[in-house]
Amino acid sequence: MSFNHQQIEKKWQQYWADNKTFKTENETEKPKFFALDMFPYPSGAGLHVGHPEGYTATDILSRFKRMQGYNVLHPMGWDAFGLPAEQYALDTGNDPAEFTAKNIATFKRQIQELGFSYDWDREINTTDPAYYKWTQWIFIQLYKKGLAYVDEVAVNWCPALGTVLANEEVIDGKSERGGHPVERRPMKQWMLKITAYADRLIDDLEEVDWPESIKDMQRNWIGRSEGAEVTFGIDGTDENFTVFTTRPDTLFGATYCVLAPEHKLVEQITTVEQRQAVEDYLEKVKMKSDLERTDLAKEKTGVFTGAYAVNPINGKKVPIWIADYVLVSYGTGAIMAVPAHDERDYEFASAFSLDIVPVLEGGDISKEAFTGDGQHINSDFLNGLNKVEGIAKAIEWLEEKGVGEKKISYRLRDWLFSRQRYWGEPIPMIHWEDGTITPVPEEELPLMLPKTDNIRPSGTGESPLANIAEWVNVVDPATGKKGRRETNTMPQWAGSSWYFLRYIDPTNTEAIADPELLKRWLPVDIYIGGAEHAVLHLLYARFWHKVLYDLGVVHTKEPFQKLFNQGMILGEGNEKMSKSKGNVVNPDEIIESHGSDTLRLYEMFMGPLEASVAWSTNGLDGARRFLDRIWRLLVNEEDGTISAKIQVSDDKTLEKSYHQTVKKVTEDYEGIRFNTAISQMMVFINDCYKAEVIPTAYAEGFVKMLAPIAPHIAEELWNLLGHEGTLSYEQWPTYDESKLVDDEVEVAVQVAGKVRAKIVVAKDASKEDIEKVALADEKVQEYMAGKDLVKVIVIPGKLVNIVVK
């Protein structure tokens, strides 16, 4: 017999909605638990089966914690600004707001059909002016703190599309859409000074319970390195440039320098003979994105400027080259090259026949660079020193001579915050005709995104907002001064950098949220989402949170106490699901055919939550069979009432199995090991089928344990067991340690050195009693027939050894 999932699921979803079962009150007597999902971008495609995996995990924890007596905050919202909606609007002429609203409605319907216990009264949407008012407010605070500034930055400009592209949108020097040529062009952009927080962003990772791999990715992205900044003079001029190096002890091996093609000195120092070659090279570089330029596998290219630098440590002249693998935005935009001990420098020097001088002992530089450590050679006063001594001595010498100093450098760059797009938060700044910039007065926020039916790119590199003259042009009422609004919009990362705070108090018009409520709910207790957000989103959110901490808005240094990354659900052939491969599984169809409880159970049973696993229709059918098995065990086939097997009883048959199950499921839910919790529930159900009687208390306890994973069928069974309303706030079952231990033990019996039988005796049986039972055993008597008993050795609880002759 099977249960009618469609009827049961609709019934309980309606009940939860009508009764606002999961509405979170701000009560203070209960401990709090804030379970957060990475909110989705509502695309046109709707949910696929990968989305519910993380959402089911947070839902299990939320339902589990409610039953443990926690006040649970479990919200959902929409990260709804972004390129796809704008692209759709460009292609169809429709308003991106309409497209977005339609997509949100689809996502919300699908999410509700999966039975997640969200408090929908806290739903947020980053495109809602009441929400982005506070995104703009945060930007103004960043500006006031000197953390938002305008800078001229090289961007990927696509003349054909009339817009700037992100690095990810450029492939081999052409736009991903349409394959148009892309060039590098300097443009004024808003930047956020995330580098000012670099050390704190590294150090505070110690305070959070995150996967070590994600912490390492963030540390590497920030890329803190200690070394020295060294000044190289340019031969025959008063000019100089600085390089950062982690190995100032290898300066004696620096045989050439490389400047980024965009370095401000290039034009000045290039000789007449080399000018044409340098200009040709600069043209080529314009077509490449930073990602292509720094690809380690690509062929090394570069050109000699004709100029020489003076190595400060030995006075030798070294040639100055330009090469695309040096970026002006990274470090000082110049490097010293020590080809004997660096693979990239070695390849470059070999390609262009430049000198290679070893300064560390070991290796064979005629074959390859030696990147190991050895004593210093060919290094004058550093000879014979090891790495640590050499670095210290070199820095001391550089500082003494005034040509260098100890320095910490970071790989992290400031965050380029401008987007030349329409569908994003307007940046609330005004550029005045006298060259000053001021924020929009805070009382005038939100600065609304104007409605327009022309969101074509402006063609000037500005966003489509530049086309809306009546919005762009402003006059200061006090002075009559003319100004222009900032026409760039914020990136999609903006709204997601603080959204978790708004769930705490989503309708507050006076502040991001009530300070007392922020104190009550922060930090987020568990944040579950994909590892693809390991760096950018998580780093940006941590940065904004630290700024808000410094402003006194929040009281925690870190926003997310525990982070968990679910794995990916792959197609049946172990490939990533994608529309182009035609292997996307739509949850709507599964909910229709198998039910959302089955989908939730299956996705949690596929394997460890953090593993990537292939979708299997057989596995899905197996999950449904398990739920059918539970239903058949507990419900009469004929009349749909509760089975006669379930009785108020103190029958001990299932006692150990039940207490083991409560212990295992409780610990596995806490540890986010849902697959093994389900395995244990399967063991218990098997035991129940073998038992004559199932005590009512055990049936009720089991239904409570099933509820976080399969909430609809659990609610229905709870009602059939004679209860009214929802089990969402019922007390979580408890176990008794003493019931996990058997009263009886199995003891092996050896006759003449071989195990001949196994006997079961009371755990506390005396040696005499154990001996009696052993000697009375039929098999033992068989092997003793015709032999004399010499002695019996009893090791209680383990072994009886019968010696015969």
From Swiss-Prot:
**InterPro entries per UniProt:** aa-tRNA-synth_I_CS (IPR001412), aa-tRNA-synth_Ia (IPR002300), Leu-tRNA-ligase (IPR002302), Leu_tRNA-synth_edit (IPR025709), M/V/L/I-tRNA-synth_anticd-bd (IPR013155), Methionyl/Leucyl_tRNA_Synth (IPR015413), Rossmann-like_a/b/a_fold (IPR014729), tRNAsynth_Ia_anticodon-bd (IPR009080)
Q: What is this protein called?
A: Leucine--tRNA ligase
Species name: Lysinibacillus sphaericus (strain C3-41)
Q: Tell me where it mainly resides.
A: cytoplasm
Transmembrane spans: none
Motif ('KMSKS' region) spans which residues? 576-580
Q: Which UniProt keywords apply?
A: Aminoacyl-tRNA synthetase, ATP-binding, Cytoplasm, Ligase, Nucleotide-binding, Protein biosynthesis
Q: Which domain of life is it from?
A: Bacteria
Which GO terms of the molecular function aspect are on file? aminoacyl-tRNA deacylase activity; ATP binding; leucine-tRNA ligase activity
Organism lineage reads as:
Bacteria, Bacillati, Bacillota, Bacilli, Bacillales
Catalytic reaction list: tRNA(Leu) + L-leucine + ATP = L-leucyl-tRNA(Leu) + AMP + diphosphate
**PANTHER family xref list:** LEUCINE--TRNA LIGASE, MITOCHONDRIAL, LEUCYL-TRNA SYNTHETASE
